């Protein structure tokens, strides 16, 4: 499948350039090694502080800080010093995986294990002749902190919000081992993709 070849090449080069979240590299390699499915954009979960020019203006927003691990109060305070214009939010988001399946049967399999692994917002839809499964959790947190460079939240409240955000991030990440185990089961059923083995050897040299 041409689309999978392109996706694999992109993934392997991103791994070489250290542009992939390190704690999900093994899981992404596992998913992409399975016949009939592959990933597109994915994230291991993140917490950070986002500045938006106005509500919903995501294309123009910018992260003052964004990490894929628990964030410290000191990191947040330093990042807030860079706030200039727009609304300021603390955001915590769970892991998310976009998995393309060749057939509806494969899409249903991926959808089922996403739900079974605790990712309750897992959905899938048809796109042209393929099916896109979004494996997504419920651990989202958005907290307003200020506007136009002015921080309204007190240090005490900021510490509290960061603590909750970190706990939600860790809760989302705690489901990753179960998701990996379930993809191992799918691999036993669908088999390993020879294209994956070939490109992995050529690009990653392993």
Curated annotation (Swiss-Prot):
Which enzyme type, at the first EC level? transferase
Coiled-coil stretches: none
Record Pfam families: TYW3
Q: Name one GO biological process term.
A: tRNA methylation
> What reaction does this enzyme carry out catalytically?
4-demethyl-7-[(3S)-3-amino-3-carboxypropyl]wyosine(37) in tRNA(Phe) + S-adenosyl-L-methionine = 7-[(3S)-3-amino-3-carboxypropyl]wyosine(37) in tRNA(Phe) + S-adenosyl-L-homocysteine + H(+)
Assigned EC number = 2.1.1.282
Q: Give this protein's Gene Ontology molecular function annotations.
A: tRNA methyltransferase activity
InterPro entries assigned: Taw3 (IPR022908), tRNA_yW-synthesising (IPR003827), tRNA_yW-synthesising-like_sf (IPR036602)
The UniProt keyword set, sorted, is: Methyltransferase, S-adenosyl-L-methionine, Transferase, tRNA processing
| Free-text function comment from the UniProt entry | S-adenosyl-L-methionine-dependent methyltransferase that acts as a component of the wyosine derivatives biosynthesis pathway.
Family statement: Belongs to the TYW3 family.
Q: What is this protein called?
A: tRNA(Phe) 7-((3-amino-3-carboxypropyl)-4-demethylwyosine(37)-N(4))-methyltransferase 2
Q: What is the lineage of its organism?
A: Archaea, Methanobacteriati, Methanobacteriota, Thermococci, Thermococcales
The gene for this chain is taw3-2
